[in-house]
């Protein structure tokens, strides 16, 4: 789903993607960075900079993450190694700089744990006051997907998410209440495959792996 978010953001005519920060969750940060660089190159947008975020010591993805997303995080699809590298600047520093430079034109869209966002808020209090966030995570009126009380992104670093909510001035939470109503089927992936492009096939393969996994875990 994060790979699709990248693709849709790049394709949207009214959006300019100025950078991507990679975090842990379904995979480790180094693997997330490699995947992001490879996907941007696949989408002919390898000029977009990628920044590595922080990660807890000894982090290992869960077995259920590997089952749903594949051990490589992209449905076991083999992506050609990217020819570019991540930026040396830490992700939190990039976000702080971007908010100062872009102002109200910038919207940050976290789709993983809140660790990087909380780090930026702690490093620069003005980041919390001036950033606009639309985050994927949480569950308000429905059960969680890790435990009945916990959603996957929030559960990775609940302390960071608590810090975010305590200090943010403008955050929209898009939780399971919304995302569970958003359906993607093999009809859509079939249309991508039918384009005959390399990117279309890659994204169809990724999504169909995801669909098969959820057909097992959530057959309803």
Predicted regions and their residues:
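N-terminal acidic, glycine/proline-rich low-complexity segments
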Residues: 1-220
């Amino acid at each position: 789903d994060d790979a699709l978010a990248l693709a849709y953001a790049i394709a949207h005519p009214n959006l300019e993607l100025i950078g991507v920060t990679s975090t842990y969750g379904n995979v480790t940060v180094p693997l997330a960075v490699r995947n992001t660089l490879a996907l941007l190159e696949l989408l002919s947008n390898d000029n977009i900079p990628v920044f590595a975020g922080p990660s807890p010591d000894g982090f290992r993805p869960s077995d259920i993450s590997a089952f749903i997303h594949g051990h490589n995080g992209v449905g076991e699809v083999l992506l050609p190694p990217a020819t570019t590298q991540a930026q040396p600047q830490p992700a939190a520093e990039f976000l702080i700089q971007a908010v100062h430079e872009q102002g109200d034109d910038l919207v940050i869209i976290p789709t993983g744990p809140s660790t990087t966002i909380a780090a930026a808020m702690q490093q620069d209090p003005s980041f919390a006051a001036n950033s606009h966030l639309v985050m994927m995570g949480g569950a308000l009126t429905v059960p969680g997907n890790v435990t009945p009380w916990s959603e996957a992104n929030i559960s990775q670093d609940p302390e960071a998410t608590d810090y975010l909510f305590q200090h943010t001035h403008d955050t929209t939470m898009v939780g399971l209440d919304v995302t569970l109503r958003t359906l993607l089927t093999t009809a859509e992936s079939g249309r991508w495959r039918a384009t005959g492009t390399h990117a279309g096939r890659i994204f169809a393969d990724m999504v169909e792996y995801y669909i098969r996994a959820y057909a097992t875990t959530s057959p309803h």
